[in-house]
Amino acid sequence: MENENKILIIRVIRSFEYRTIKNLILKDIDLNTNVSDFKKLVADKIQTTPGFTPFKTKQYDSMKIFFVPHGQKPNNLTINIENDHFFLNNNKSLAENGVVYETEISFFVMEDYLKYKENPENKW
């Protein structure tokens, strides 16, 4: 049976308007992990990984697939606002949500996302 542990790229988004984004590379992630448990893991990594000091103050609560390997990248460089079906369901595993090896997942605050989606304007 194929090993289910994969590398995932998490795009931690502090600000949509200013494109304040930092990538967190996670290795050996079991794709059968529940999304709610995965969010806790990522939040813990943000608190303990060097270089994420400006990102520690936000309470990130949502995940959405930004890019699936061998797929088309979205036009918006901050987040994939075209495909709302890419939100990760907390009650399903990563694999059940369509996450595969080297998937890029955005991690952000939903309230900030909704404001940005109404007016996707960059301020820089």
Curated annotation (Swiss-Prot):
Coiled coil: none annotated. InterPro entries: UPF0538. It comes from the Eukaryota. Belongs to the UPF0538 family. This is UPF0538 protein.
